[in-house]
């Protein structure tokens, strides 16, 4: 089987054993090499021939280093480091992170509980009268040496540095007053008061915003304020929030953004449902940083839009033969009950596309005929609507006949020989059909649009891959896709692309439509419904896609304290004005990045940044979701570094790198990332580590130790890495992910998770006693050094999973996991694990499934990763693809982590 990467040629350097930075080969936290058993210790079933308990990556539960080898352990003076209780409810009591064992003992002696479980700050007390908050000490800076204390993957699971606010900062002492990191994360949790200090730090100041943490409201409920009493500042239009102050016996409030004094609305303290006075201290908008207001009439330009899905389905030869037409028709039919339709206004339409456009008029249920009528239009230059009505039908009124139509759709085109695809003209026609109401055009296609509007040609050239000319292939080939996207955005039309080609499809051009309309590009390379794994993956994902409670006709704006300005916005939307982002549809599985400029000196001890998303719910209600984040300010560079969030910074630079790739080229994007890593290390060394460090170390704060590793992993990601083997479509699809994924999924896509399964702890793969969630084994570093030849490993980047089977895996392990007595019978490639009647099989399947669980990561996503079984001595293309996930190794044209740290050390 050819690997989806086009089959990497074996490169030198694969599987090399890099030496730990200036240390013996055995990494701290890794058990000694397996010895032949002496018969004296208890052995695992799979280990009879090979190893004893107490060896392998999980030997010390969590790769605990020997005493004294504490990597990035935060010293005990700072019990609050990053402890956000909500972050920690990730389905298991947090694994004892490397080096935290010593901390825990010291805390125990001090009478302090586990540092990971302490609240980030004391709940502020309600002020009797407005008072200036006292200055409180911010996070302390803990320098570490990146060369003598190598990075441990568990550090990526630490929460961000806590936001330290003085007591009394919020109007009421609510634990929910500040925005949780799953919705908004700042790259800096202590904000410089001046532009010059920010510039000196060389750190970016940006927000990573993910307004929704799940595809459905029920999975992530936020307080809804139904009374339509929305109090906003008259000058800056900020919404009242937990950080305002009340004056004049509570009759007026001072805006925490611009300081203007506003009147409190009369109805603010009145409970309209109970018709009696209400306690202001219980109002959600004064206690919760994340709330949703039901909007009154003045927030609507027109009646709320209904949910509209127009399906543009490719019915050319490629799409019929690979099973896309049949699978998508069946999947839509089976998902009709999942499409949101509480207000019974949801409308659907269908256009089939080959060298002509085929419209379908579907009669209402109970009409004389139930048969759909097909109307064919072959004028591709000026596509017209053959009949104005009946092409968009109401789901509730035509439910049965929509099913009749979907059953017949496949038969209509089953014998086609038509190789043309006029998808550009179909998009134009679809726009004509739904632009009066707005809605979503969902494109399902297996072909390159080769006739009509926006026709594209095969432009991939193997000879330019890996050269400077490759970057031109990542740009749009036809201006239609950008200009048409802007038209769509103005008419509240959003486009989603589901692409299934086995040949070049020009993802680079097609992905512009989702990019500017708040949509997404979903890419299924080499997909074929005859492979059950392919059919099941698409069916599950498409059904979740249709069920998602998207927002409609939405706009997003971020306001902030005087002195701060939103300068640049990144993500899939159209930037309508300097600070307004327009979304014809607002998805729930994407994040956005907003860069913040400091225009004038900030004089306040706390700044606030407030994100507001005005949208129509898919049930026809106009709402505003408001997310308010308060951050302390500082004039001290050490505070800025000590409170910087490495994952948010990596997310910001991921978006920057995609922008640079599309603007200047791949090489420039990679060089900019390396230059940034050097600049940050040099700045820290010069400004905060006293200029010169004895012994040639590489100093960086404990909270940023993962940043150089994340930069290397980003440079080696499919979207950016230097290689002559990566098909352009694969690269373009990866760039789409790097610029849209929610933060937890993006970090995993850049630095995948790897779990050792053959020696996982006894509780892994079983439900946790407290939470009932499946316990995952501790993750291990992405280095071939961590892989033993008799091992079984799961490697998961959130899009693809690999189950790596070592060449010396013992027969009992293969029997328990795969039900096969002999290694030679093990099939490699895409598959699902068999369900066998033994405990270990159940635990391995539970770990594979739990690793896919988006909800426990606090994000919405439709993706169900494929699982590939890889034999260490099996199919080379597949093996090399899996090995590209080991970002700490040397591979293809990329350096190892040891080489990378060495080169950074030289440049710093």
Swiss-Prot record:
Residue numbers binding Zn(2+): 233, 236, 255, 258
A Pfam match: Gelsolin
Membrane-topology annotation of the record: Peripheral membrane protein
CDD domains xrefs: Sec24-like (cd01479)
Single biological process term from Gene Ontology: intracellular protein transport
Main location: cytoplasm
Annotated keywords: Cytoplasm, Cytoplasmic vesicle, Endoplasmic reticulum, ER-Golgi transport, Golgi apparatus, Membrane, Metal-binding, Protein transport, Transport, Zinc
InterPro entries: ADF-H/Gelsolin-like_dom_sf, Gelsolin-like_dom, Gelsolin-like_dom_sf, Sec23/24_helical_dom, Sec23/24_helical_dom_sf, Sec23/24_trunk_dom, Sec23_24_beta_S, SEC23_SEC24_subfamily
Cellular component, GO, one term: Golgi membrane
Assembly description: The COPII coat is composed of at least 5 proteins: the sec23/24 complex, the sec13/31 complex, and the protein sar1. Golgi apparatus membrane; Peripheral membrane protein; Cytoplasmic side.
Protein's name according to its UniProt entry: Protein transport protein sec24
Gene that produces this protein: sec24
């Amino acid at each position: 089987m050819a690997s989806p990467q086009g089959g990497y040629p074996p490169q030198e350097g694969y599987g090399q054993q890099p030496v730990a930075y200036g240390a013996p080969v055995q990494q701290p936290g890794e058990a000694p090499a397996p010895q032949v058993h002496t018969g004296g210790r208890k052995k695992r079933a799979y280990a009879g021939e090979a190893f004893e308990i107490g060896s392998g990556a999980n030997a010390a539960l969590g790769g605990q280093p020997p005493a004294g080898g504490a990597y990035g352990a935060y010293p005990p003076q700072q019990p609050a480091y990053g402890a956000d209780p909500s972050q920690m409810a990730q389905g298991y009591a947090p694994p004892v992170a490397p080096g935290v064992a010593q901390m825990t003992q010291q805390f125990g002696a001090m009478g302090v509980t586990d540092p990971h479980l302490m609240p980030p700050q004391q709940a502020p007390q309600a002020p009797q009268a407005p008072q200036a908050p006292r200055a409180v000490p911010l996070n302390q800076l803990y320098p570490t040496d990146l060369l003598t204390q190598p990075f441990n993957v568990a550090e990526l699971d630490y929460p961000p540095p806590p936001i330290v606010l003085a007591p009394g900062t919020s109007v009421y002492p609510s634990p929910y007053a500040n925005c949780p990191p799953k919705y908004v994360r700042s790259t800096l949790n202590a904000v410089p008061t001046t532009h010059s200090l920010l510039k000196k730090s060389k750190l970016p100041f940006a927000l990573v915003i993910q307004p929704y943490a799940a595809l459905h409201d029920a999975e992530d409920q936020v307080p809804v304020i139904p009374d339509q009493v929305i109090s906003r500042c008259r000058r800056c239009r900020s919404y009242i929030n937990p950080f305002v102050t009340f004056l004049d016996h509570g009759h007026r409030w001072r805006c925490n953004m611009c300081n203007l004094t506003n009147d409190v609305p009369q109805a603010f303290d009145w409970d309209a449902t109970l018709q009696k006075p209400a306690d202001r201290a219980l109002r959600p908008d004064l206690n919760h940083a994340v709330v949703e207001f039901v909007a009154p009439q003045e927030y609507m330009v027109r009646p709320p839009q209904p949910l509209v899905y127009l399906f543009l389905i490719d019915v050319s030869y490629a799409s019929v033969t690979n099973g896309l037409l049949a699978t998508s028709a069946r999947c839509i039919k089976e998902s009709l009950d999942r499409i949101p339709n509480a207000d019974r206004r949801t409308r659907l339409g269908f256009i089939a596309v080959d060298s002509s456009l085929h419209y379908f008029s579907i009669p209402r249920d109970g009409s004389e005929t139930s048969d759909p009528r097909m109307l064919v239009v072959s004028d591709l230059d000026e596509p017209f609507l053959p009949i104005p009505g009946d092409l968009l039908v109401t789901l509730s009124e035509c439910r049965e006949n929509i099913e009749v139509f979907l059953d017949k759709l496949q038969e209509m085109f089953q014998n086609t020989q038509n190789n043309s695809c006029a998808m550009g003209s179909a998009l134009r026609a679809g726009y004509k059909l739904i632009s009066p109401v707005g809605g979503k055009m969902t494109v399902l296609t297996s072909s390159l649009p080769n006739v009509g509007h926006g026709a594209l040609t095969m432009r991939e050239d193997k000879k330019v891959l890996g050269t400077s000319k490759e970057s031109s292939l990542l740009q749009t080939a036809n201006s239609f896709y950008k200009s048409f996207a802007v038209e769509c955005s103005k008419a509240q039309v959003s486009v989603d692309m589901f692409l299934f080609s086995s040949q070049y499809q020009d993802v680079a051009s097609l992905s512009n439509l989702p990019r500017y309309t708040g949509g997404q590009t979903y890419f299924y390379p080499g997909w074929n419904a005859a492979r059950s794994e392919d059919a099941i993956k698409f069916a599950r994902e498409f059904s979740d896609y249709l069920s998602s409670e998207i927002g409609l006709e939405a706009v997003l704006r971020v306001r902030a304290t005087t002195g701060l300005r939103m300068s640049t916005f990144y993500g899939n939307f159209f930037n309508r004005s300097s600070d307004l982002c327009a979304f014809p549809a607002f998805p729930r599985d994407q994040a956005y990045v907003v860069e913040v400029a400091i225009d004038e000196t900030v004089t306040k001890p706390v700044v606030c940044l407030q994100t507001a998303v005005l949208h129509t719910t898919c049930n026809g209600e106009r709402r505003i979701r408001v997310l308010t984040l308060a951050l302390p300010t500082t004039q001290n560079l050490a505070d800025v570094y000590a409170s910087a969030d490495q994952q948010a910074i990596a997310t910001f630079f991921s978006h920057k790198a995609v922008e640079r790739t599309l603007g200047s080229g791949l090489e420039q994007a990679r060089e900019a990332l390396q230059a940034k890593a050097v600049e940050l290390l040099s700045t820290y060394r010069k400004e905060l580590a006293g200029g010169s460090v004895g012994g040639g170390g590489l100093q960086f704060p404990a909270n940023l130790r993962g940043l150089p590793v994340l930069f290397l992993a980003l440079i080696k990601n499919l979207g950016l890495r230097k290689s002559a083997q990566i098909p352009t479509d694969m690269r373009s699809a990866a760039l789409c992910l790097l610029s849209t994924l929610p933060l937890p999924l993006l970090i995993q896509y850049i630095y995948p998770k790897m779990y050792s399964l053959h020696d996982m702890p006894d509780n892994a793969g079983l439900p946790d006693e407290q939470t009932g969630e499946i316990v995952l084994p501790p993750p291990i570093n992405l280095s071939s050094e961590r892989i033993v030849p008799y091992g079984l490993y799961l490697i998961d980047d959130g899009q693809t999973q690999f189950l790596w089977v070592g060449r010396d895996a013992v027969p009992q392990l293969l029997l328990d996991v795969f039900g096969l007595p002999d290694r030679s019978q093990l099939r490699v490639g895409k598959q699902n694990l068999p369900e066998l009647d033994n405990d270990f099989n159940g635990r391995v399947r539970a770990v594979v499934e739990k690793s896919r669980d988006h909800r426990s990561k606090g994000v919405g996503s439709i993706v169900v990763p494929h699982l590939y079984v890889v034999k260490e001595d099996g199919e080379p293309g597949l093996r090399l693809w899996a090995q590209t996930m080991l970002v700490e190794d040397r591979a293809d044209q990329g350096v190892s982590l040891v080489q990378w740290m060495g080169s950074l050390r030289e440049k710093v």
